[in-house]
Amino acid sequence: MQPPTSHPQVPAGLPPDVAREVSQVLSRRNLLATLGVAAAGSALAVVSYRDEAHAATTPHTAKAAAATGETTPKHAWCMVIDLRTCDGCAMCTRSCQQRHGLREEQTWIKVYSMEDSSGGTFAMPRPCMMCEDPPCLKVCPVGATLRTDEGLVLVDTDTCVGSRACMAACPYEARYFNWTEPPASKRMPMPSTPQMPVAKKGTVGKCVLCADRLPQGELPACVSGCPMGVLYIGDLVTDIAVNGPGNTVVLSEFLRDNDAVRYKEELGTNPRVYYILGHGQKLGGQA
């Protein structure tokens, strides 16, 4: 296994709330620094261990773009979830809900209890899979679902008419209908954008990987909110991934060395969320 890159650690003895803020600042600096260094070194690096097999069908990867003469996106976002260290605390869910002004039942990232091979259980966070071939995009009657060049699948709630066709098409059950107006919060009233959507009544909402944060080098709320460092935000172009505590890994090596898998990969949606499994864990049925 490729060891995480060493970075400044949070000083010991700080109050929990202060330590959390310091950790998030260090993580943000880490993401900005590593993205900048990696991008300057090689904008057309091999983007992941599985691209040899998928280059012909994934036009938003750096290799495929180079082969076709297309402009290479600066980033190709993905997520890595290390289930070996997930304790099911659901802080990822709560951090997301707080950031996006969601109600308790609106779980854009949901933690499932799964059964392992020994009959025990383990926790599995499930965000939007950010599919390279998203079924939800094809069925929307008004074009409210879009996919950016950097691989983010977003919803324009100003266009969405709430047909729920996208919900039926999503094999991951990662979309939610907004039955009520969003609760009052500090970010309201604010205009809704695909990068920072407002969960307006009568529309469909979903995880957007905190798309408004990424250009500033900030971590998604679920990543920074996870106390166990389970969630990594990764970039297939620069080939790095960073978690909340600030650990940085070479993405392709991290995936390869830990035999990363993708949920329901057999469906051909090419999800950009990778799971690292512990002993006896499998992405099968719920417990």
Regions found by a protein language model. Name each.
Residues 1-26:
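N-terminal secretory signal peptides
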Residues 19-30, 40-66, 280-281, 287:
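N-terminal twin-arginine translocation
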Residues 55-68, 97-125, 146-159, 174-203, ...:
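Non-heme iron-sulfur electron-transfer modules
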